[in-house]
Amino acid sequence: MPGSLPVNTESCWPKDVGIVALEIYFPSQYVDQTELEKYDGVDAGKYTIGLGQSKMGFCSDREDINSLCLTVVQKLMERNSLSYDCIGRLEVGTETIIDKSKSVKTVLMQLFEESGNTDVEGIDTTNACYGGTAALFNAINWIESSSWDGRYALVVAGDIAVYATGNARPTGGAGAVAMLVGSNAPLIFERGLRGTHMQHAYDFYKPDMVSEYPVVDGKLSIQCYLSALDRCYSVYRNKIHAQWQKEGTDRGFTLNDFGFMIFHSPYCKLVQKSVARLLLNDFLSDQNAETANGVFSGLEAFRDVKLEDTYFDRDVEKAFMKASAELFNQKTKASLLVSNQNGNMYTPSVYGCLASLLAQYSPEHLAGQRISEFSYGSGFAATLYSIRVTQDATPGSALDKITASLSDLKARLDSRKCIAPDVFAENMKIRQETHHLANYIPQCSVEDLFEGTWYLVRVDEKHRRTYARRPVMGDGPLEAGVEVVHPGIVHEHIPSPAKKVPRIPATTESEGVTVAISNGVH
């Protein structure tokens, strides 16, 4: 058929395409959810038990989506001693829009200036919390295409999740994840194993162009999330079953075939319910499921329920959450470290879960495992796909390196500063009043930011934003942070138009000696 390709093109693809390195960034301050319950005057446990959240990271007016992404990209490049020359594609997934035309990706290109590398494909991708996954799939597809030039792809997912005062506010958060994508990766995307579901709904959306706050239909949002999970899992199971049949194995796929399961996490309790939901899918698809004992023990009464009738059935939910408790503890709970401690990061949420998993298990434990990832973005778009971890867990291996790079994750979370709820509320008020302003100088201090964090210096009268980086103790001049470490491709250096914009130096001693960068002429 015209436009189609033969199936036997496997030998043409690069080997083991996937995630080579991963970096995560979250704000240096948080509000305690127990204290927030008291401050908001709600019942004890509403946020901590009902939502499953312990702490919520948040940004001051010193950080925006550009600064979050600048920080996480430079940290990934520095930690892995990478040259900016080795990046051939850079794509950003975000729903935090501060400019309706200029992309975050173009702001990040300032980090590439010293290398002279401007031959970098990709742009921003947006659909609620799904944008990071779409960007990641685009990167995988680029490497497996005729357009690939042998260099890495860099995928960035970042967001600032804020809500108006009320029930939704404790489900906020902020952060960014950067992923280096290439061949011979330790985290390999299983080709052909994606179950996707796309549908129209007004479950969560942001129609007000001057507000950061969404319009949310809470009940519909939960139904959309769970129905998408049902559909994606069904499509995924059909695809892997078809693959197995071609390989001579004819059996059904169940959750036991996943070593770990991670999910987009608006809040941790929904993830726990999602594991229960998948077990319900397994139960209903197996007409011979043993209910006298085992994981399905005592569930015979639910044999004839219909999935579409059970989204808000408390009896079904309670029974399957109990039945799936051990499954959740073994395969999912560890992945919720960042979600529980930092909140919902929107596009990077599911990849924060991946980072949490990698940070808490040894390479030997992870080797050879199949990890399922469920990504969901309101509106709505969802995919369930799987990653196969390499078998090579030897010291110095790619798997050893990626887990070692995340070994300080819990310590970084513990090093953050706890902020009182009233100060948090004041920060939210400042953001609401100033996030869209021109000719604005941020009010909050940079002293509480982590070392190496990029921050907003000012917004000029034309809405052009200027950034600086908080120095890293022990480093030399800040310019060294973006120098070429391992130049591999010779480029003609093309001066960036951003350099024509006057640099705005730090105005106070507390801001330190920094190199400021601007997003240039709009």
Curated annotation (Swiss-Prot):
Which GO molecular function, any one, fits this protein according to its record? Answer: hydroxymethylglutaryl-CoA synthase activity
Q: Does the keyword Membrane apply?
A: no
Q: Which Gene3D superfamilies match?
A: 3.40.47.10
Recorded catalytic activity of this chain's protein: acetoacetyl-CoA + acetyl-CoA + H2O = (3S)-3-hydroxy-3-methylglutaryl-CoA + CoA + H(+)
Its localization reads: Cytoplasm
Q: Which Pfam families match?
A: HMG_CoA_synt_C, HMG_CoA_synt_N
Highest rank taxon of the organism: Eukaryota
The yes or no answer to whether the keyword Translocase is present is no
- EC number assigned by the record: 2.3.3.10
Write out the GO biological process terms.
acetyl-CoA metabolic process; cholesterol biosynthetic process; farnesyl diphosphate biosynthetic process, mevalonate pathway
Family statement drawn from the similarity comment of this UniProt entry: Belongs to the thiolase-like superfamily. HMG-CoA synthase family.
Under what name is this protein listed?
Answer: Hydroxymethylglutaryl-CoA synthase, cytoplasmic
Species annotation: Gallus gallus
Task: Please spell out the taxonomic lineage of the organism that makes this protein.
Answer: Eukaryota, Metazoa, Chordata, Craniata, Vertebrata
Gene responsible for this protein:
HMGCS1
